[in-house]
């Protein structure tokens, strides 16, 4: 087993620690301080840093962490500009192997050109591509790229656990409800996540099979989602990619 430890950072970021005995990997350490505190509290040795993309709230802690753990390896996307450190830059289909854990690299452009996700052992570390009940903004890529990236992630097994990088779930669900007000899965999820957040608990990880029921960005082929997008756009939409494009621009101003 590879327990995953949640490290909250900033206002709504999550940094993930993947643990094996007294060793660990860290995913998207935007801030070193909470990571160092957790490593010290648990007496863990940092073996490697995994980055999904180049935004500062995901890479800002790299220099300090490497200062404390100079032998830790650094991995990140080959097609994104990475921190000025020696690292192994990864592309689609590459693998990381660590204490029996094999993580496959999946190129998921959209949020950034080079954004990657790490998948293995039933876990998906997807940065700012797929969120619970939502998806990332398009800072560099196109709607077509993001839609294709989400479709690729949606093809993973139902029991895949999604470890994304932000606590956006409730706001995403409110948008989903605006799109599909008659979707009972969305209504039930709002109740569940509201209770978790009131207790100060994270809404993550989320199960991919459940996401297909309430994440409207994974439901662009559904008539109910298409109808709502057409009503918002005041035009007919020919395919799921067009529906996604409308949903993403709608969410940007929701």
Curated annotation (Swiss-Prot):
> Binding of Zn(2+) 1: at which residues?
53, 55, 111, 128
Q: Which GO terms describe its molecular function?
A: hydroxyacylglutathione hydrolase activity; metal ion binding
Q: Which residues bind Zn(2+) 2?
A: 57-58, 128, 166
Q: Look up keyword Metal-binding and say if it applies.
A: yes
Query: In its keyword annotation, does this UniProt entry include Metal-binding?
Result: yes
Per the UniProt record, one Pfam family is Lactamase_B
- In Swiss-Prot or TrEMBL terms, this protein is called Hydroxyacylglutathione hydrolase
Name its species.
Aeromonas hydrophila subsp. hydrophila (strain ATCC 7966 / DSM 30187 / BCRC 13018 / CCUG 14551 / JCM 1027 / KCTC 2358 / NCIMB 9240 / NCTC 8049)
The gene from which this protein is expressed is gloB
